Amino acid sequence: MMSQPAKVLLLYAHPESQDSVANRVLLKPATQLSNVTAHDLYAHYPDFFIDIPREQALLREHEVIVFQRPLYTYSCPALLKEWLDRVLSRGFASGPGGNQLAGKYWRSVITTGEPESAYRYDALNRYPMSDVLRPFELAAGMCRMHWLSPIIIYWARRQSAQELASHARAYGDWLANPLSPGGR
């Protein structure tokens, strides 16, 4: 008997989703998978008033949490930052009694506006992407979650339709079975 694939909560955070061809292409396979709940934060919370109990319930129901977003000023879009600060609260995700996410998996899926070569100590952005993402890795650790290597689509707006389709296929394959031996 085959085991069921892990339940994935895909938190999508892009304030200008209609303008992001890359993110729309990446998101498409997720909407076709029964084990994935795609949750567009900007569509649900345009006023930034986050339903914290609802979001925490969604987190409890899933084993893998994916944060799909563009890189904004070396961080994340404002609503996702608000979501992280409010939903991953002390007593729920960290601190005394805060073990609701312990043992779950965190993966960042990020699009950038610059090439990979711009993310080096001697390049334009002065730091590699691993340094830029360190606060998110620390947040995963604070929640006692397993940090999975991020998926990064560099220079997303310059990717050809074929390249984006290839990234989307690989992403969809991973989402379909994220905890398989080759998926982590």
Swiss-Prot record:
Its main location: membrane. Its EC number is 1.6.5.2. GO terms for molecular function: electron transfer activity; FMN binding; NADH:ubiquinone reductase (non-electrogenic) activity; NADPH dehydrogenase (quinone) activity. SUPFAM superfamilies: Flavoproteins (SSF52218). The keyword Isomerase does not apply. It is found in: Cell inner membrane. It is an enzyme of class 1 (oxidoreductase). It is a peripheral membrane protein. InterPro entries: Flavodoxin_fold, Flavoprotein-like_sf, K_H_efflux_KefG, KefG/KefF. GO terms for biological process: positive regulation of potassium ion transmembrane transport; potassium ion transport. Keywords: Cell inner membrane, Cell membrane, Membrane, NAD, Oxidoreductase. The keyword Cell membrane applies. GO terms for cellular component: plasma membrane. Gene3D superfamilies: 3.40.50.360. It catalyses: a quinone + NADH + H(+) = a quinol + NAD(+); a quinone + NADPH + H(+) = a quinol + NADP(+). Belongs to the NAD(P)H dehydrogenase (quinone) family. KefG subfamily. Interacts with KefB. Regulatory subunit of a potassium efflux system that confers protection against electrophiles. Required for full activity of KefB. This is Glutathione-regulated potassium-efflux system ancillary protein KefG. It comes from Shigella dysenteriae serotype 1 (strain Sd197). The gene is kefG.
